[in-house]
Design a protein with these regions (language model features):
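Extracytoplasmic ligand-binding site segments that recognize negatively charged/polar headgroups
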Residues: 1-11, 84-88
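Short helix-initiation/N-cap motifs at beta->coil->alpha
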Residues: 20-50, 62
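Ligand-binding "clamshell"
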Residues: 11, 66-80
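Small-molecule pocket liners
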Residues: 73, 87-96
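Secondary-structure end/capping motifs
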Residues: 99-171
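Alpha-to-beta junction loops
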Residues: 45, 50-59, 71-73
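A short alpha->loop->secondary-structure connector
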Residues: 10-20
Length: 171
């Protein structure tokens, strides 16, 4: 979704983000573009920007907050400000897999629904515990303070500029 949100935002500001033409053999999305957009794995974005390989990035959290935390960048806008309550993440499986593992499929979907409910219940009271879990190397592995900035209803645009954004992460 970030690719489309970035392209929408750039176009709304008068910057042509380019377009895709797979029927012409082009899948880069750079045709007639005013800006070069490239793909970098999200966890590598802060280090790639710090190295000077890229000048900015569009990504989900906690990688924007990581740039603020490291002092190498600042978010200029959130996707929530571009499109409130936008569809963010998708869990998809193939029909073949769903038919081969129907019980597993059902259990995974139920577990995700329960986790989402747990994250949102009691006015987000479980978010601090989720931050501790996600900070472990076997999960996201980002610093707790970085994760907390977006998971607990605040967002830091630059060092010291923390704002309440209670609906930033709604599950």
């Amino acid at each position: 979704t970030h690719n489309y949100e970035l392209r929408y935002w750039l176009a709304a500001g008068g910057i042509h983000p380019g377009y895709y033409a797979p029927h012409k053999g082009d899948t880069s999305g750079q045709i007639d573009a005013d800006a070069l957009l490239s793909v970098t794995p999200p966890p590598q974005m802060p280090a790639t920007m710090e190295a000077g390989t890229i000048y900015g990035y569009c990504v989900g959290e906690p990688w924007n907050q990581q740039a603020v935390f490291k002092g190498i960048g600042v978010p200029v806008i959130t996707d929530y400000e571009i499109w409130k309550n936008n569809p963010e993440k998708v869990f998809g499986v193939s029909n073949v897999w769903a038919e081969k593992y129907p019980n597993t499929h059902l259990r995974v979907v139920k577990a995700m629904i329960r986790a989402a409910m747990w994250l949102d219940e009691n006015n987000n009271a479980n978010r601090p515990e989720a931050v501790k879990i996600l900070s472990k190397p076997s999960y996201v592995g980002a610093d707790e303070a970085v994760l907390a900035n977006s998971m607990t209803g605040t967002f830091e645009y630059e060092k010291g500029d923390k704002r309440d954004v209670p609906d930033f992460n709604v599950f």
